[in-house]
């Protein structure tokens, strides 16, 4: 085991603070509407230009082991805020730096670190309760657009496209962000349930101009096995021929004689039919077939639950208003399932999402829930260059997370105002001793830090702006975008409550640990052995006689 270096007391804290400051100073320049860019070097390709706090934090590794520990702990604050709320990473970093700086000064002055931490924790618990009281629901699409605009660094086009997407697919719907081909942002919305399986034979196509199959008011047959024998399908096909309605077959596979017979019947116009493979694999396929069954009001024909295809009747089939099948996708629009059953299925999937530990499973469950609840929207980000595209895509993703957080827990006045108002309400918090009281004061001072940083980045004097805002009341605050004061809600400057809450809680949690640090242990870097010297040249051969 390699030898370790141990640093104690004030020496340890000074090193740690140096690391905290290097990382936080690089991140905090991005805060607010007039935040600056940070350029990140990439080992290949062009550098990345970003205003996203967590992207900057993730790039930073310091040479000094002890300073690096401080930087990594603040990086953890940014990552945690990003994971929980998807935004607020820069705010969390600014708060953490403010608490650590003031806290370590107090420890150096001889105060008890544990009491300081208790004071900070009490202040944060009280602040979170006040934030919830200050919060307002974010229901209409105007508020959603404002939240998204603020999170996307005041880009209104991003705010509007996210608000439109949310309106179209609902709060449970899935919105994905992709790189587009054009210069402008585009929005594609798929209503109904879509899965990535196309027609099994091009002979099913009945709309040659679009190369797709369109079925109006079809029956939907769902089978959890391969169909290769046409005899199994005959009872259903005979019943269908009498109704004159089309049929969509969703099965593990349709092959051989069964597929050939379906194609011939379709081409002769005896029955209008199309077949597709069931989406997914294994257990996920069973679950997705059940989703389609609930959406269309049908039953999955599966031998493991005692249902045989030969004995299936028209009562076992689902129905929908319309089905569109392309080479790659099948979309079922307006399934005729019962709303109560669909809602029960959605809440069941929600429960599974909460219990799941795998990010991949969560994502797939989220997709299934969206397909049942509303639909899927794809935002295609447009830009002139690849560098701009990456930067813009990161901002759209941030804005999307912020919007979801706003819908979940509501909104508070933005621009750092919410924390300033909360701080003034909890200033008289009761504590046990003077050191704890100082801990509360540290937390209250830190809550002004985001507002001060926004003002600094906008080129204003932070103390003047902070005092003006503190002397105001309610939603009165500073709009750094156009350098004016006024009602933040009326000016459309909103922050999601969840983002502000998570930033404060994670910053205080990790800053509290750093204040109570008394020793740091790191490996002593090994000096690599010197290279071998070059070998001497070989003597020339003597002249030959």
Curated annotation (Swiss-Prot):
One of its GO terms (cellular component) is cytoplasm. Its EC number is 5.6.1.7. ATP binds at residues 30-33, 51, 87-91, 415, 495. It comes from the Bacteria. PROSITE patterns: CHAPERONINS_CPN60. One of its GO terms (biological process) is protein refolding. It is an enzyme of class 5 (isomerase). It catalyses: ATP + H2O + a folded polypeptide = ADP + phosphate + an unfolded polypeptide. Forms a cylinder of 14 subunits composed of two heptameric rings stacked back-to-back. Interacts with the co-chaperonin GroES. NCBIfam families: GroEL, PRK00013.1, PRK12849.1, PRK12850.1, PRK12851.1. PANTHER family: 60 KDA HEAT SHOCK PROTEIN, MITOCHONDRIAL. Belongs to the chaperonin (HSP60) family. This is Chaperonin GroEL. It comes from Shewanella putrefaciens (strain CN-32 / ATCC BAA-453). The gene is groEL.
